[in-house]
Amino acid sequence: MALFAAAAFMTVPSFAQQTSPPPIAAPSPSGNQAAASGQPDQAEMMKQMTELAKLNENHKLLASMAGTWSYTVQMWMNPDPNAKPEVSKGTAIRKSMMNGRFFVTDVTGNMQMPGADGKMKDMTFKGMGIEGYDNVKKKFIGTWADNMGTSIMMSEGDYDPATKTFTYTGEYEAIPGMKQKIREVVKIVDKDHHTLEWYEDRGGQEAKTMEIAYTRKK
């Protein structure tokens, strides 16, 4: 192969063999040039990212809720406000991940749900949530997935220290074209108890459809 390549090179006219000078590489902009052109200074950007990656009091607040919890949930599936709720129980295990930046909760329980025939049936419920505090958005953030669907719900919220209450808002789409706005209120009663109330937007009116009471297992 080298021989054929050399022969081919010999047949090329001499002007084609002349090599042009290598292109001059454009100098990389200095920090001052980058700032002048509107580009962030890389060193400053890395410094800011390092600061934003640090844990703070908001992460410590989430850490205080780590542990194993038993829960009792009440669900109002009937739109009639006077209807009795469906009651079920389960366990939630909440653990730290990524050195306390996030907290993952594994939920297992039994609940009554309507089957395809409309009759109530016992089913095993499994769910997983991840919560954290986003230093960039300055918001508490959460995701939720369970064995009752294939989507992942995302939410953002704030914490009111005066009432020891988290308030999250989000949206999910259980059926195509039917997006549902939700509001989730988590109130810390004490270090061993907290509650969760779930509200859904039903035709422009908010209705509470679920309430969960958590007790820390010791």
Residue ranges and their predicted role:
Residues 12-16:
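Sec/Tat signal peptide C-region and signal peptidase I cleavage site
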Residues 2-11:
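Bacterial N-terminal signal peptides
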Residues 18-218:
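Hydrophobic small-molecule pocket/channel-lining residues, especially in calycin-type beta-barrels
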